[in-house]
Amino acid sequence: MGSEMCIRDRGMGNEFLSNIREADAICQVTRCFADDDVTHVNGHVDPSDDIETITTELVLADLQTMEKQLPKLQKEAAIKKESRPKVEAWEQAKAVLEEGKTIFSAGLDPEPLHDLFLLTTKPFIYVFNCDQDQLADADFQAKMEKLVAPAEAIFLDAEFEAELAEMEPEDAAEFLADAGIEEPGLDKLARVGFDTLGLQTFLTAGEKESRAWTIHKGDTAPEAAGVIHTDFQKGFIKAQVVSFGDLVEFGGEKEAQAAGKLRLEGKEYVMQDGDVVEFRFNV
């Protein structure tokens, strides 16, 4: 979601808000760089103001929902005692919204609010599109991080990232080193996005193909097997597991096994990010 686009369009329409409701997280891209050839809709660049504008739109949309639904729940709670804890949770959330804050930033439990399909219960990620000077400005970054906390803040130069994406891996590594950048911004965005969504990766390796699979944090070995094929989950017996780090450190599967790093796990095993797995199953 681009801040300037929403400002230009004078707010978010119902269709746009509906699309956000279906999302699992909100990633807001905010312009920070100054460029006379790229006009900002407000005539000046102020990322703090842009973020406040979008936040206000989302908060007002949630308040509208809350003001419509809360009285109904309050009437229900007058008859059903079991509804009273939910009323308290909704009233607490409404108070946060009335302060102009998102429910996510207040750290409230989103579970009691699930039926409302609110926008600001979702986790937020902020991407600041900067120039190279801003990428080297620790004070500027600290200010932006404080502004959006507890959300994750990612700083990148989109033009730089576009050039990087066109390069061969060796040239890209040299380009990053010359710029004093340890990690491409898009790589960090992918990593933070995975973490924010509660996702992780495991790997399978065979003679014909090696591939990564996406699962949720906390998934067990049978659940991970089911991502590959439902038969793997139904007939799950064991999982042969080694971490990717150990595989690299010891130079291969046989070497990792000799070092005692290869193990068999059962149905209760909770998958870890970077596990390299061979599933044993019976159909």
Task: Place the predicted regions along the sequence by residue.
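Short, compositionally biased low-complexity segments
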Residues: 30-38, 60-71, 147-150, 161-164, ...
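Extended, highly charged alpha-helical segments
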Residues: 48, 53-90
